[in-house]
C-alpha cells in the first residue's frame, strides 16, 4: 500500500492507494489550473453562496461537476470544490485499475475499498473527541464522505454544529450537502441545532446514503450509516 501527501496551495491531500507511480499530483495540479483559470473569468462562480446560472457548454470536467453539485445542493459552486477534487482524483485512480484508494482533502473523502476500511469522523467534539469513525464494508463503487463544521476549518458556515458528515455516492455532492445541512444547525441549544439540521436533511434524501450530525452533547442521524467504531485520535489538515 502506498501513502502520499500532496500539498498544492489550498489543496491538502492524504492518499492511501494500492497503485504505485500513480502520478496523482500532476493530475491534481492540472485540475487546479483549470479551476483557477475559470475563476479569473467568472467571479460569481468563486464568490456566490448560491447556485450560479450559466449557459456555457465548453467547460472542463471539474467546472461541470461543481456546477452540477451546486445546483443539487443549493449552495455556491465553491462549496463543492474539495469534495470534487477528491472525487475526480479517485475516478482517475480507478481508471488506472485501483481497487483500494482513500483520498482525504481537508476532511472531504472519496474512497473505493475492496476490503474493510475505517474512516475517522473529525468533529473536535469535547465529549467524543476525534476518536470515532465509520467501519466501511468492502465495496466496488466510489463513496464520498464529507464533513462541514461551524466551529473548525476555514470554510464558510452559518450553523454551529461541531460536525455534519454526509455520505453520498459522489464526494462533490457530499461536500455541498455537508455545507448546506451544517448551515441549518442553528437554535438556542445543541438539541435544536441537531433537530433543525435533520429537518433540512429531509429535503435531500435522494442525494445521500446517510448523515451524521454532532453538536456538543447531542447526536442525530438520518439514512443508513456504517457501523460507528472507536479509533485512535487523529487530526486533519484544513
Swiss-Prot record:
<comment type="similarity">
    <text>Belongs to the UPF0280 family.</text>
</comment>
<protein>
    <recommendedName>
        <fullName>UPF0280 protein Msm_0088</fullName>
    </recommendedName>
</protein>
<dbReference type="InterPro" id="IPR007183">
    <property type="entry name" value="UPF0280"/>
</dbReference>
<dbReference type="InterPro" id="IPR037456">
    <property type="entry name" value="MA1715-like"/>
</dbReference>
<dbReference type="InterPro" id="IPR003374">
    <property type="entry name" value="ApbE-like_sf"/>
</dbReference>
Amino acid at each position: 500500500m502506498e501513502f502520499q501527501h500532496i500539498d498544492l496551495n489550498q489543496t491538502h491531500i492524504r492518499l492511501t492507494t494500492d497503485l504505485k507511480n500513480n502520478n496523482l499530483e500532476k493530475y491534481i495540479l492540472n485540475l487546479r489550473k483549470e479551476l483557477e483559470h475559470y475563476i479569473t473569468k467568472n467571479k460569481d462562480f468563486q464568490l456566490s453562496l448560491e447556485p450560479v446560472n450559466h449557459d456555457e457548454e465548453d467547460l472542463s470536467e471539474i467546472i461541470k461537476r461543481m456546477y452540477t453539485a451546486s445546483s443539487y445542493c443549493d449552495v455556491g459552486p465553491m462549496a463543492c470544490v474539495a469534495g470534487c477534487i477528491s472525487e475526480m482524483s479517485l475516478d482517475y485512480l480507478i481508471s488506472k485499475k485501483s481497487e483500494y484508494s482513500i483520498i482525504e482533502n481537508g476532511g472531504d473523502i472519496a474512497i473505493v475499498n475492496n476490503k474493510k476500511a475505517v474512516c475517522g469522523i473529525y468533529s473536535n467534539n469535547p465529549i467524543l473527541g476525534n476518536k470515532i469513525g465509520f467501519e466501511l464494508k468492502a465495496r466496488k463503487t466510489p463513496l464520498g464522505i464529507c464533513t462541514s463544521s461551524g466551529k473548525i476549518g476555514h470554510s464558510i458556515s452559518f450553523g454551529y454544529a461541531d460536525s455534519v458528515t454526509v455520505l453520498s455516492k459522489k464526494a462533490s455532492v457530499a461536500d455541498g450537502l455537508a455545507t448546506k445541512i451544517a448551515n441549518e444547525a442553528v437554535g438556542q441549544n445543541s438539541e435544536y441545532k441537531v433537530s433543525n439540521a435533520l429537518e433540512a436533511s429531509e429535503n435531500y434524501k435522494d442525494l445521500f446514503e446517510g448523515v451524521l450530525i454532532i453538536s456538543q452533547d447531542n447526536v442525530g442521524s438520518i439514512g443508513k450509516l456504517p457501523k460507528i467504531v472507536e479509533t485512535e485520535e487523529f487530526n486533519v489538515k484544513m
